[in-house]
Amino acid sequence: MSVTTCQILDGKALAQKIQLGLGERIQTLKSPMGRPPGLAVLMVGDNPASAVYVRNKEKACTKIGMASFGRHFSTDTSELEILAEIVRLNQDERVDGILIQLPLPKHLDAVSLLYQIDPKKDADGLHPLNLGGLVRGEDCIRSCTPAGVMALLKEYNIPIAGKHAVVVGRSILVGKPLALMLLEENATVTIAHSRTENLAEITRSADILVPAVGKANLITKDMVKPGAVVVDVGINRVADRLVGDVDYAGVLEVASYLTPVPGGVGPMTVAMLLKNTLLSYERKL
């Protein structure tokens, strides 16, 4: 049995809709606050993909009326220099959100730098206090990519409660926080990873399947239950194009919903980053 009509989960369209709402909210709040919300993005080195992501974030800020403060450091910048900039941004009243663009050069400890960001300005939702708040189910800043996945599922009215959700990947960026968010919505959650022995058997049992590994075409048609919802978080460069972790053409034949790459989760991550920054701004009212 195969599903003949698969609906595309259009992250680009939803992200634009969210950003439109954020822009309207900013226009309303700008006068009482005396300034727009501000997002600072720290980038170290010359990773081409990171440079594209940073430009996209800056463009999105401009589009909705949010101030952006880009900080670009050379590859050989010391951890102390980055730390000094984080301390300065923590104290800057114009800045409501701080993001460190990952990955960082190998000589820098991303975790220790993330820990130095004021939790109230943690636009990426990766500070231990915010991750701990997620574990406890508190109202806190949520990790952007997992929050974007959840927003997509909710926008398309996809049932989550009681469903078996399989997350492939256990990173602190996506896999672990997403599993917690799905659990919060009463899904039964399985996390699969590089040491999982029976991956295809597990993915075939998923009502909601979220690969987040960074390995092109990892999930093939035969690994997906007919009618499953597939949200592809992976982004991989293959020759001259970007692809996800899913064999798109094959899985399109069996899934009931599927995200494209690009145009699926990526734009949602940026929208959630802006939403988190606006939330931090609003909490100063």
From Swiss-Prot:
Keyword Oxidoreductase in annotation: yes
UniProt keywords, alphabetically: Amino-acid biosynthesis, Histidine biosynthesis, Hydrolase, Methionine biosynthesis, Multifunctional enzyme, NADP, One-carbon metabolism, Oxidoreductase, Purine biosynthesis
Q: So what does this thing catalyse?
A: (6R)-5,10-methylene-5,6,7,8-tetrahydrofolate + NADP(+) = (6R)-5,10-methenyltetrahydrofolate + NADPH; (6R)-5,10-methenyltetrahydrofolate + H2O = (6R)-10-formyltetrahydrofolate + H(+)
Q: Which GO terms describe its molecular function?
A: methenyltetrahydrofolate cyclohydrolase activity; methylenetetrahydrofolate dehydrogenase (NADP+) activity
Alphabetical GO CC annotations of the entry are: cytosol
Q: In which pathway does it act?
A: One-carbon metabolism; tetrahydrofolate interconversion
Tell me its EC number(s), please: 1.5.1.5, 3.5.4.9
Kindly give the Pfam families that the UniProt entry links to this protein.
THF_DHG_CYH (PF00763), THF_DHG_CYH_C (PF02882)
The record's InterPro entries line, in alphabetical order, gives: Aminoacid_DH-like_N_sf, NAD(P)-bd_dom_sf, THF_DH/CycHdrlase, THF_DH/CycHdrlase_cat_dom, THF_DH/CycHdrlase_CS, THF_DH/CycHdrlase_NAD-bd_dom
Q: Does the keyword Oxidoreductase apply?
A: yes
Query: Which family does the record assign?
Result: Belongs to the tetrahydrofolate dehydrogenase/cyclohydrolase family.
Name of protein: Bifunctional protein FolD
